[in-house]
Design a protein with these regions (language model features):
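Non-catalytic helical/linker scaffolds that mediate oligomerization, partner binding
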Residues: 1-476
């Protein structure tokens, strides 16, 4: 069997002050990190560029293949600054939101979206800091929005604003986001997590911009965190490379009790479409302060894996928490334990029901998955140039690892989020005989012993995107 039992569920870690030095990055990679997330809601290009450079150095030093995700700020609304860095709201207090650039207080403060007064109506709620403070709109006077605080609460500078039930008219791609995406193209990031995607066109706008900047192959993962995004999920999945279920803002925009249902629905839809899905936000939130998670957090991570998520994500836990390494190790242990108990036969049957078996490449991958289950093979070795074969295999969730040899370092990184896939950089082969010989070498390097069986699959050497053969091989 494979020498180290491989974690199939991938882990995304947000990197910040608690984790951005070289030694801590090495620890996080050893603990199970697959993708580094850079949150462009905070920090500048110098800081993010430094993180990316350090990760590349670490990858080179220790032979890891951790990919880079750029997470956009998105068309979010934030408060301005407050005198003293924070303000205290009192229930029943009148609070005025103004487009004027001021250093504010609970009585009067500014926000980043200057035309909110055009969109809101009396009776709407404006939620501040993930809903910690609720402001009920009383009336709009000129460009000022007069509200009444529904509860007490403290709010620090530049906290997020949500306006559930109100359709906001701002442009999806701000100048900041455009510049950030161009920076990401220059930095060769592998994934873009696009915040507050509301419709299909938002995804297409990002894809157009990155293509114009010479990087059409960067994978775009819309974050579903508002009502419109949920309503338009089918058309968004159609054009996306994957989805992130961003439960923080989503849980403010919709009733909290709806979030688990939405999470399950989106994961199911992505699984059926063969698209990556990441479950994110507050998964191990208490580990920002504590070395061990709550039992509820363990169950949350476990249930996302049972639901079929490809990846699970850490935010503040790894970016600014006291225990970033412990948080990754905790996720890793949960993933291993749950993966041991998955009903792989049932998952395979469900995947086959939703597969396009009129497609020859899909039919071969389906056959590989069925043979792997029936013969209890030790691994699937899926040779791939673009990653297409390995991605197809991933949707069938085989019990054994999918080892994906590829001559492309870019493909290695882009497979970092696919469930069960272990990408391996290898030399290019032009013949089937050469591929089979290489499969033997790769199998042994991954701890598969003589006498064990693997399935070798892939496309015609030199032809991208197709899966055209499978062969059961006994390791010699």
């Amino acid at each position: 069997m494979v020498k180290e039992k491989m974690k199939k569920t991938k882990i995304v870690c947000t990197i910040g002050p608690a984790s951005q030095d070289k030694e801590m990055l090495k620890k996080l990679i050893k603990a199970g990190m697959n993708v580094m997330r850079c949150n462009f809601s905070h920090g500048d290009y110098e800081e993010h560029g430094m993180k990316m450079d350090i990760l590349r150095e670490v990858n080179k030093e220790i032979g890891s293949d951790v990919a880079i995700m750029l997470d956009t700020k998105g068309p979010e609304i934030r408060t301005g600054a407050f005198e003293g860095g924070f303000t205290e709201f009192k229930k029943g207090q009148v609070s005025v939101i103004t487009p004027e650039e001021i250093v504010g207080s609970a009585d009067r403060f500014t926000i980043s979206y200057k035309e909110l007064y055009k969109d809101v109506k009396p009776g709407a709620y404006i939620l501040v800091n993930d809903g910690q403070v609720a402001l009920l709109v009383d009336h709009v006077e000129g460009q000022d929005i007069y509200c009444v605080a529904a509860n007490d609460g403290r709010v620090k500078n530049t906290r997020g604003i949500n306006v559930p039930g109100t359709k906001l008219q701002f442009e999806f791609l701000s100048e900041k986001d455009k510049n950030d995406l161009i920076f990401g193209c220059k930095q060769d990031v592998n994934f873009i997590a696009a915040s507050f995607v509301r419709r299909k066109q938002d995804v297409l706008d990002i894809k157009k911009l990155i293509a114009e900047n010479g990087k059409p192959d960067i994978k775009v993962l819309p974050k579903i965190e508002c009502v419109e995004g949920v309503e338009n999920i089918d058309e968004i999945i159609e054009v996306a490379d994957g989805i992130m279920v961003a439960r923080g803002d989503l849980g403010v925009e919709v009733p909290a009790e709806d979030v688990p249902l939405i999470q399950k629905s989106i994961i199911k839809k992505c699984n059926a479409a063969g698209k990556i899905v990441i479950t994110a936000t507050q998964m191990l939130e208490s580990m920002q302060e504590n070395p061990r998670p709550t039992r509820a957090e363990v169950s949350d991570v476990a249930n996302a894996i049972y639901d079929g998520t490809d990846a699970i994500m850490l935010s503040g836990e790894s970016a600014q928490g006291k225990y970033p390494e412990e948080a990754v190790l905790t996720m890793n242990k949960i993933a291993h334990k749950i993966e041991e108990s998955l009903d792989y036969a049932s998952i395979l049957r469900r995947a086959i029901r939703t597969a396009d078996n009129s497609n020859s490449s899909e039919a071969i991958c389906m056959s590989v998955a069925e043979i792997a289950a029936n013969f209890n093979v030790s691994a699937i070795i899926a040779f791939t140039e673009t990653g297409a074969t390995a991605k197809r295999m991933s949707r069938y969730r085989p019990h054994c690892p999918i080892i994906a040899p590829t001559p492309s370092d870019d493909t290695v990184k882009k497979l970092a989020l696919n469930w069960g896939v272990k990408p391996v950089l290898c030399k290019s082969m032009k013949s089937r005989e050469g591929l089979m010989d290489l499969a033997m070498v790769i199998a042994k390097e991954n701890g598969i012993s003589a006498g064990e069986q693997v399935i070798v699959t892939g496309g015609t050497p030199g032809v991208s995107g197709l899966t055209s053969y499978l062969e059961i091989v006994t390791i010699k």
